[in-house]
Amino acid sequence: DFDASVDESFLPEIIRLCKENGIRLILVHERTLLFPSAAAEPKALQAYKRVLAEYLQANNIALLDFSYDPRLPEEYFTDVLHMNAAGKAAFTQLLAEALKPLMQSGQ
């Protein structure tokens, strides 16, 4: 439950410090194969991620979500959590492409 745990986490403090120091905070969900699709993800995790996204949006924090990105297929992983060299290269390119407009616009 995100709401029950957020105040016990460092996230509010990280956001506060970033805002105070003019730092643009961007959070990223990487793809894993642990839950290969949204349908495979437990309902509690889906709810947690949804409330987290709402919290970040309310605090003007960008969230880049690659959780189920089809451009990162199973062949790019050495196991359910870790990408192989090809996966790392592909993810780096995707991340750079996603970050570029955020950095240019200052959103």
Regions found by a protein language model. Name each.
Residues 2, 78-79:
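Short coil/turn segments at secondary-structure junctions
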